[in-house]
A protein has these predicted regions:
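Basic, flexible Lys/Arg- and Gly-enriched helix-loop patches that mediate nucleic-acid binding at interfaces
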Residues: 2-160
């Protein structure tokens, strides 16, 4: 049984358990792959509590301990859990059998600190635009910048 303190949406509980992303949980619900107390649920937004037994793809959902890894991502590694081009991923850099995923991303040709976790709630807080959490980047440049270029950077750079 998965511990839920109060009534919560089923897809959120599934995602917070570490089983899959919220969007994937919604897809599983719509496709009839989720049961609550033995009853198939296909309604998004269905509410559950701590007494409910949730089954996803014929497996009882169990509470997963939250795991947090602060990882230095080197250049030449993709910030995904798998890569169709066969490139090394951030998960290739660690040894774990847990379903972890990166919080945010760093480009393939960049290096830096990256958080890996199975905590969907924390991930949502950190990356959702409504929370307006700043990200800080340090860039090395070749050459010497002039005054105009420095002023432009000091104003900030908006990245799409």
């Amino acid at each position: 049984m998965f511990l839920v303190i109060s009534m919560e949406r089923l897809q959120k509980v599934i995602a917070n358990s570490g089983y899959c992303s919220r969007r994937k949980a919604e897809e599983l619900i719509k496709n009839g792959k989720v049961m609550v107390n033995g009853k198939k649920i296909e309604e998004l937004g269905f509410k559950v509590d701590g007494n409910d037994i949730i089954t996803v793809e014929n497996k009882i959902l169990k509470k997963e301990n939250k795991e947090y890894i602060l990882l230095y991502k080197p250049r030449g590694v993709v910030t995904t859990t798998s890569d169709e081009k066969g490139r090394k991923t951030v998960l290739d850099l660690i040894e774990t059998n847990k379903r972890l995923y990166p919080v945010g991303r760093l480009d393939y040709d960049t290096s830096g600190l990256l958080l890996l976790t199975n905590d969907g709630e924390l991930t949502n807080i950190l990356i959702h635009p409504k929370n307006e959490i700043d990200k800080v980047y340090i860039a090395k440049i070749n050459g010497i910048m002039n005054g105009f270029e420095i002023k432009t950077l000091e104003k900030g750079v908006l990245i799409d």
